[in-house]
Structure formats: structure tokens, C-alpha cells
């Protein structure tokens, strides 16, 4: 499992004093209010202030003191140590842990690997790349087991639930 988890991506500058606008990669933006530090390119940085906007977060990060400096951080990921992450409820997983999981069906047939997790609102969808690309709804009727330790996700056979 990865030691660091991405919680946001710097998408723009905000103002002229080095604040950055962050697109959250977490399902609860309020978590940013509790963050004391983040890692950017492996370097620890203190969070000096946090403002929540409807779809983004504005952060003042230690060492970024001008709009020019903030511009250098566009498209950079903000990461936290796994040990500082929220504890997930049973049956919930970090996207970082699902990516590259091997997907097999209940008959043992290899489908591919999870390459992305798409948020749809009602349920997540796993993008699985193998011989072809398969979109797998992340619902209990289809996904029967997730074993993060062994990086394996088991689903019902495609012919049972997939429309041609």
C-alpha cells in the first residue's frame, strides 16, 4: 500500500499573496480544515490557512508567498501520510488502493486491472483495462469481494450483468 495519499490538486493561484486554489480529491472537503501539513513532491509544507469554496479549497501554504511562486505549483498533488488519513468505514477503500488491483470474475477468469475510479454520484464505477476496457459498477450485486492486501477484486461473470 502506498505511504502517501493524494487529497487534492493545485489547479490555480488565488489572489496575489501566494494562495493556491485546490481541487479536492476527497469526498469531504471539510477535511482540509483539519489538515496541518501536506506533502508536495515529497516535501512537507505547513498549511497556514484554509478557505472552503463551493467546489474548491483555497490554501495558504508555507513557503508560497507570491503569485509567481504559486504559479509554479499548478498541477501539483497535495498528499498526506496514510497514517494521518481518515479511518474509512468497513467496505470503503481509498482509490489509491484500488488502482492496479487485478479484477477476476467468480469463475477465476482474468478481466484486467483497475486503471481508474469514476465518481458518478450514485455509485463509483471501476474502469478496468485488459483485453478490452470494461466499466464495472461498484455495487454489491456485481462486486463480490475486494481484497486490498492481495490487490484483487472479484466480480460476477460479465455475461450475467453486462448488456451486449
Swiss-Prot record:
GO terms for cellular component: cytosol; ribosome. The keyword Cytoplasm applies. Coiled coil: none annotated. GO terms for molecular function: ribosome binding. Its main location: cytoplasm. Belongs to the RimM family. The PRC barrel domain binds ribosomal protein uS19. Binds ribosomal protein uS19. This is Ribosome maturation factor RimM. It comes from Clostridium botulinum (strain Hall / ATCC 3502 / NCTC 13319 / Type A). The gene is rimM.
Amino acid at each position: 500500500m502506498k505511504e502517501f495519499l493524494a487529497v487534492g490538486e493545485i489547479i490555480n493561484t488565488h489572489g496575489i499573496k501566494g494562495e493556491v486554489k485546490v481541487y479536492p480529491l476527497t469526498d469531504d472537503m471539510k477535511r482540509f480544515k483539519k489538515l496541518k501539513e501536506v506533502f508536495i513532491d515529497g516535501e512537507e509544507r505547513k498549511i497556514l490557512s484554509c478557505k472552503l469554496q463551493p467546489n474548491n479549497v483555497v490554501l495558504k501554504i508555507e513557503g508560497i508567498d507570491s503569485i509567481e511562486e504559486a504559479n509554479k505549483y499548478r498541477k501539483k498533488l497535495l498528499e498526506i501520510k496514510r497514517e494521518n488519513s481518515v479511518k474509512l468505514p468497513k467496505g470503503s477503500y481509498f482509490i489509491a488502493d484500488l488502482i492496479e488491483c487485478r479484477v477476476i470474475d467468480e469463475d477465476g477468469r482474468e478481466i484486467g486491472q483497475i486503471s481508474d475510479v469514476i465518481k458518478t454520484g450514485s455509485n463509483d464505477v471501476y474502469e478496468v483495462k485488459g483485453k478490452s476496457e470494461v466499466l464495472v459498477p461498484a455495487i454489491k450485486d456485481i462486486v463480490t469481494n475486494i481484497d486490498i492486501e492481495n490487490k484483487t477484486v472479484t466480480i460476477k461473470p460479465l455475461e450475467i450483468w453486462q448488456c451486449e
